[in-house]
Amino acid sequence: MVNPGHGRGPDSGTAAGGSNSDPFPANLRVLVVDDDPTCLMILERMLMTCLYRVTKCNRAESALSLLRKNKNGFDIVISDVHMPDMDGFKLLEHVGLEMDLPVIMMSADDSKSVVLKGVTHGAVDYLIKPVRIEALKNIWQHVVRKKRNEWNVSEHSGGSIEDTGGDRDRQQQHREDADNNSSSVNEGNGRSSRKRKEEEVDDQGDDKEDSSSLKKPRVVWSVELHQQFVAAVNQLGVDKAVPKKILEMMNVPGLTRENVASHLQKYRIYLRRLGGVSQHQGNMNHSFMTGQDQSFGPLSSLNGFDLQSLAVTGQLPPQSLAQLQAAGLGRPTLAKPGMSVSPLVDQRSIFNFENPKIRFGDGHGQTMNNGNLLHGVPTGSHMRLRPGQNVQSSGMMLPVADQLPRGGPSMLPSLGQQPILSSSVSRRSDLTGALAVRNSIPETNSRVLPTTHSVFNNFPADLPRSSFPLASAPGISVPVSVSYQEEVNSSDAKGGSSAATAGFGNPSYDIFNDFPQHQQHNKNISNKLNDWDLRNMGLVFSSNQDAATATATAAFSTSEAYSSSSTQRKRRETDATVVGEHGQNLQSPSRNLYHLNHVFMDGGSVRVKSERVAETVTCPPANTLFHEQYNQEDLMSAFLKQEGIPSVDNEFEFDGYSIDNIQV
């Protein structure tokens, strides 16, 4: 039952002395529902003390009907949990569903389950009886919280609302306006921040598009630009040129340091390749080469002096000769007028103990059966020359054909060891006979050379000669002596066939193409070589006194008597003999020389010579023709039997010297 006296909020408020001017939460409308009248009276007094407007009900159904009639007549409801007609939780549900008012539950039962049930059903608070005034003073906060979330100004703007409610509504509206303003400000800030972010993203996208569209322009090195680059590099120096300085000197807009660095690297690679090609083609621009060094050939003569002949005769110490030769191995000598250039020849490969198979040409080739002259015996690496030998003579390069008719091993030297066939150009010869120099007794076999000797005049310019072009050195002529015809004629008169130095007239310049084997070939050669002047040629075979270390060396002699008289060719000594195939003995050691017409390799290296013996051609290993009728067994037997064998006439004489004395 509702207490009408207390249910009138304005009347009770006026009687209590309240006014509309009291601030919030005064005049808060409260509906109290409880079946205990004592508890109901106590609550009414405490709520009125707090300036609330109170309405009392002792039944739950009466309170629910009152709320339904006046949905907007109350601000908050306080209900007991245990009532006889309706459970307090049931009322809580109806009020919450129909009026949506805040409901406070109260009970003497403080069990946790009951409190939890009230909260779960929608109660805003749970008060334990007896209720204290301190708890009632703060019930207004639930009204504010509820109104803040669900209060609608349009629904609560009617005249039926009391003044206290109007004040409360105005205050709530002010709060909501403030909240709306703050939220609008926040929303504006959020929108502005989002706008700024979008603008930043757009700017970044534009930057990316600009960076992608603005690629580095490719530099095209035109001819003018490259010339500026080369001029800057030449001014700075190739070694000292750096991209930064080159860029400053060029001063080209749009050109970067990276472009200059890349082009400089390519330019240096080009210069290295160009320098390598020029050095490979001849080393003519080498910094260690002078104008006088740009010729070919070993250091065999210096300013017209025959150093090796001077060393043999004792006028030049062997140590000095060795030093000069060692210094000259890698340095070409100066070419004299009227002389042909000859490539550097390795003097260590004079003898090679292998079986060469050398082609002589046109099906008449003669090869030696045994090229191993001294089987198992090491030979010296340098050949000594006799006094009077013209070492630095006119020579020409005649490459030997490398075809092997019978599949024998090739004895052709390498590129640096090409054989040189040269003829003497010296017209002077003060020696009328051969002088054999024995290495073991140099003081007895050497003599002082006169100043008019051919050693001191190796390069005459007044020699009448005929010339012919060379295949390997175009434009270089080789003077030859007329005395070669005498050698050919004397060989024909003796009955032998001269099989050497022929073939110079062949257009192919093959040294072995025109070597004859029969007498009719010699006549043809005589007709071809009428105007040739080949002089000062000879062959010296020498053997050591010790048979175990014997060796054969080819040397050059300058005597004109080698090609004149047969009596001079018959001179011999009786130290040791070498038995030939026809019963003739080759004497070794010997002080006399049997001089034969031959062509030798310049600088004391390999010689190629021809002999007057019929059908024989001699050469040392590595492209020199050996006497075919004297095989290895004959020579070895001769060297081993040199002791105790009497002197026998022969056409070949050998002068021996120790291999150990050969200068390297």
From Swiss-Prot:
Traits of the deletion mutant: Retarded growth and development, and early flowering. Reduced responses to ethylene and cytokinin.
Domain Response regulatory: 29-144
Biased composition range(s): Acidic residues: 200-209
Domain of life where this protein originates: Eukaryota
Keywords, ordered alphabetically: Activator, Cytokinin signaling pathway, DNA-binding, Ethylene signaling pathway, Nucleus, Phosphoprotein, Transcription, Transcription regulation, Two-component regulatory system
Polar residues: compositionally biased ranges: 180-191
Family: Belongs to the ARR family. Type-B subfamily.
Name of the protein described by the UniProt record: Two-component response regulator ARR2
Gene transcribed to yield this protein: ARR2
